[in-house]
Amino acid sequence: MSWWWAGAIGAAKKKIDEDEAPRNYESVALIVGVTGIVGNSLAEILPLSDTPGGPWKVYGVARRPRPSWNEDHPITYISCDVLDSVDVEAKLSPLTDVTHIFYATWTKRSTEKENCEANGKMLKNVLNAMIPNCPNLKHICLQTGRKHYLGAFEDLKSKCHDPPLTEDLPRLDSQNYYYTQEDILFEEVQKKEGLTWSVHRPGTIFGFSPYSMMNLVGTLCVYAAICKHEGAVLRFPGCKGAWDGYSDCSDADLIAEHQIWAAVDPYAKNEAFNVSNGDVFKWKHFWKVLAEQFGVECGEYEEGQQVKLQDLMKDKGPVWDKIVRENGLSTTKLEDVGNWWFSDIVLGNECWLDTMNKSKEHGFLGFRNSKNSFISWIDKVKAFKIVP
């Protein structure tokens, strides 16, 4: 069994030095959201010599200029605002050799109604530019998430399904931009005969991207670095259910492998799949791991006084600037690398677990050891000098 299905942490990194160019490309990928937490993993894994469906030529799309931490990936980087239909048409419609689309981006608005409008428009812009112009387009992967079962952030879990969460559960009776995206996908693929799709629903993602709006590991690293700098205890900013209860997560590399599997395996076509690591953990154990990684005193759950990172970190911008200067870190602003709102949601609620049975029944046997995953992504945040 190759590393591809073995769930090996860091296997992709070990392969990079072995690959040789040039190659004749079998498949051509378009990653939309290439600087995001999963897009970055796709950009690392797709070009490898033994990636199924390959050799792959890869285009990567993101709104901002290419960051230094993404530059080593052997892809063609395209700066494009997918919310702007004119920009999309000009920059993406010429990519007529694309065979597979990996859509892994989103934008955050103040209400779910606005989320539906903006995120629906983004996906539709991309598909309108690609489907009519790519004669060999075979498959579209759409990444959504577990809020499919739990509801939008503004009414999270108010009317959610009882876990374990399975792919055949009906949609909730509420607005959800994931539903909007799915409906657009289902409608657009009908316009090209033989074009297939897959939907991927991860839980909380462990991965690396300083540009991600939902980067839990990076955010916790920044919090721990500030505690280290100030000699403070690493207080747990969450609820008892998160501290004592079972949680799970989705490794970004695993999600990338899951999407590539669905893109090339006939048995995975036209299906929606959960994607998580396949094990469970408790935050009270991972909190000790985080404290050890940064050499800080580990706090405990504080009965009756749940703290929030948004409150603890609201005045820490100057502190972070000092940490960056003193340690020669990559230049970042606290508001960019600290997704406090998202961390407060994850740690402020008990975890609603899913099941990977459907993926396994369809042939995907990938998994991750979540503790090893957590540590490996912490190491990557340090390696790219985001934290000391």
UniProtKB/Swiss-Prot annotation:
Pfam families: PRISE. Its EC number is 1.3.1.122. It comes from the Eukaryota. The active site is at K147, Y178. This is (S)-8-oxocitronellyl enol synthase ISY1. InterPro entries: NAD(P)-bd_dom_sf, PRISE-like_Rossmann-fold. SUPFAM superfamilies: NAD(P)-binding Rossmann-fold domains. Keywords: NAD, NADP, Oxidoreductase. Belongs to the short-chain dehydrogenases/reductases (SDR) family. The keyword NADP applies. GO terms for molecular function: oxidoreductase activity, acting on the CH-CH group of donors. The gene is ISY1. It catalyses: (S)-8-oxocitronellyl enol + NADP(+) = (6E)-8-oxogeranial + NADPH + H(+); (S)-8-oxocitronellyl enol + NAD(+) = (6E)-8-oxogeranial + NADH + H(+). Iridoid synthase that catalyzes the first step in generation of the iridoid ring scaffold using the linear monoterpene (6E)-8-oxogeranial as substrate. Iridoids comprise a large family of distinctive bicyclic monoterpenes that possess a wide range of pharmacological activities, including anticancer, anti-inflammatory, antifungal and antibacterial activities. Catalyzes the conversion of the linear monoterpene (6E)-8-oxogeranial to (S)-8-oxocitronellyl enol, a precursor of nepetalactones, which are metabolites that are both insect-repellent and have euphoric effect in cats. NADP(+) binds at residues 35-37, 63-64, 81-82, 105-106, 143, 178, 205, 212-214.
